């Protein structure tokens, strides 16, 4: 964000929901000798420093007391000025976030974002996650508990401020293999939010709620220029408030990125899948896992996730604990285990074409035994009525358009290509569900692209053209 940012300066507006200590509300120490008694007219000598008063006749002790009182008054004024500057910075920071982080359609999510903003103002900063190839952060609340995962746009694997040196080394030493030519670079945060949108529209409920959020924190990876400018502006606001109040932005610039709610009690799917292979699940519990797995398949296939391994989707297995207090009772509550799946790391989805160069980016869940089981009737009843309705698909496209156009580098032509791939995926999925196929058979279907047909005549209904992609990647298994 540049210096011409439309953000409001701290003196123009204040948020109604946050209050900060103001100068008038501060309690300052009483200064001895600070009060001056004004004598009545014509009674007694004039007070010191009044017109007509001879300073040479004033006792030296009174002069010293007056000087000390004046010095203490200046000290209190300086402290008040510093408090005012700090309050202005805090007000401006919250005002900056509030202008962009409003989610009236999801008040619960907005509460979590507010908790993150308050924690940052209390110097409880997000903590960088050292796994992965991008800059991602655990966001905490004022109690220090992890509440979300934030992934800034400019710290993505191909962002200019990615703190991980591996991608920088790959870009420097092997530029021909840098990036994925089937993806729109530096739109991972939109892909994360888009996957959450598709999940909610289809009522899959496996993606933790994710939205586009603006946050600023000392622990984020900023350029040296941004940090120097931030320190200079804060210093100017503290020392010369009249000058500092002219800045459009105080502090570090907010970063735009994906804000995904943190889920507790989950582990990598690879851990539980190995465990279930050694210790087979009961029939009812295994069916729960299969139903959750099918939802993951539907989501990944529609958004064409190019980065789905068994280490970036999660499983939560709540099994009944052996309670020793219940052994001697006549009544024992028998509770079946509960299995849930969470689909995270959706930042490399929504390609503008099917992979056709070096790598195929396959779905690694296709090699699991669950992928060989035909789709259940439950997933058919949940998904088929939606994706078979052209109006539903059109609404989904419009919602994705409203989300993706927020990016400064948004390109309408690229977006139409992304939607064409998604339409083809939906077409294949619809046919697979109707034909009672399995997830393994689904991924073996030829990739399809469904584009909007261009017509010189205006029509109330759109027509589409379907095409198959014949070119295959060099490595079909990688």
Swiss-Prot record:
GO terms for cellular component: BLOC-1 complex; cytoplasmic vesicle; dendrite; early endosome membrane; endosome; endosome membrane; exocytic vesicle; glutamatergic synapse. InterPro entries: Lsb6/PI4K2, PI3/4_kinase_cat_dom. It is an enzyme of class 2 (transferase). Detected in adult brain, especially in neurons in the cerebellum, brain cortex, dorsal root ganglion and spinal cord (at protein level). The modification N-acetylmethionine is found at residue 1. Residues 164-177, 267-275, 358-367 are annotated as: Important for interaction with membranes. Membrane-bound phosphatidylinositol-4 kinase (PI4-kinase) that catalyzes the phosphorylation of phosphatidylinositol (PI) to phosphatidylinositol 4-phosphate (PI4P), a lipid that plays important roles in endocytosis, Golgi function, protein sorting and membrane trafficking and is required for prolonged survival of neurons. Besides, phosphorylation of phosphatidylinositol (PI) to phosphatidylinositol 4-phosphate (PI4P) is the first committed step in the generation of phosphatidylinositol 4,5-bisphosphate (PIP2), a precursor of the second messenger inositol 1,4,5-trisphosphate (InsP3). This is Phosphatidylinositol 4-kinase type 2-alpha. It comes from Rattus norvegicus (Rat). The gene is Pi4k2a.
């Amino acid at each position: 964000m540049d210096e011409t940012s439309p953000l409001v300066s701290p003196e123009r507006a204040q948020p109604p929901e946050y209050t900060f200590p103001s100068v008038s509300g501060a309690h300052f120490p009483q200064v001895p000798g600070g009060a001056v008694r004004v004598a009545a007219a014509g009674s007694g000598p004039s007070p010191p420093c009044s017109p007509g008063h001879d300073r040479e006749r004033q006792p030296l002790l009174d002069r010293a007391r007056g000087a000390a009182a004046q010095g203490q008054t200046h000290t209190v004024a300086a402290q008040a000025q510093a408090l005012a500057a700090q309050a202005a910075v805090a007000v401006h920071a919250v005002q900056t976030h509030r202008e962009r982080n409003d989610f009236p359609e999801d008040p619960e999510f907005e509460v979590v974002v507010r908790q993150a903003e308050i924690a940052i103002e209390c110097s409880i900063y997000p903590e960088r996650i050292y796994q992965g190839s991008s800059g991602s952060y655990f966001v905490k609340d004022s109690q220090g508990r992890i509440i979300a995962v934030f992934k800034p746009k400019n710290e993505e694997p191909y962002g200019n401020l990615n703190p991980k040196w591996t991608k920088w080394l790959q870009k420097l030493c092997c530029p021909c293999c840098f990036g994925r030519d089937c993806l729109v670079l530096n739109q991972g945060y939109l892909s994360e939010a888009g996957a959450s949108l598709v999940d909610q529209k289809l009522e899959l409920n496996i993606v933790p709620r994710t939205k586009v959020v603006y946050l600023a924190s000392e622990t984020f990876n900023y350029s040296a220029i941004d940090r120097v400018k931030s320190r200079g502006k804060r210093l100017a606001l503290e020392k010369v408030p009249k000058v500092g109040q002219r800045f459009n932005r105080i502090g570090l610039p907010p970063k735009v990125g994906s804000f995904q709610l943190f889920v507790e009690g989950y582990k990598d799917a690879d851990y539980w899948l190995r465990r279930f292979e050694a210790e087979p699940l009961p029939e009812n519990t295994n069916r729960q896992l299969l139903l959750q797995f099918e939802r993951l398949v539907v989501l990944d296939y529609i958004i064409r996730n190019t980065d789905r391994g068994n280490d970036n989707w999660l499983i939560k297995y709540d099994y009944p604990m052996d309670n020793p207090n219940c052994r001697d009772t006549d009544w024992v509550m028998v509770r079946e285990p509960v299995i849930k799946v969470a689909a995270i790391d959706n930042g490399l989805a929504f390609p503008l074409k099917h992979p056709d160069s070096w790598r195929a980016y396959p779905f690694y869940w296709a090699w699991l035994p669950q992928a060989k089981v035909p789709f259940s009737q439950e997933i058919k009843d949940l998904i088929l009525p939606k994706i078979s309705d052209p109006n539903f698909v059109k609404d989904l496209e419009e919602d994705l358009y409203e989300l993706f156009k927020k990016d400064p580098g948004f390109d309408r032509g690229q977006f139409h290509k992304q939607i064409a791939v998604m339409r083809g995926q939906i077409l294949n999925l619809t046919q697979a569900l109707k034909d009672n196929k399995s997830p393994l058979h689904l991924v073996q279907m030829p990739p399809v692209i469904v584009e909007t047909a261009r017509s010189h005549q205006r029509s109330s209904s759109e027509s589409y053209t379907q095409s198959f992609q014949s070119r295959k990647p060099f490595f079909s298994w990688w």
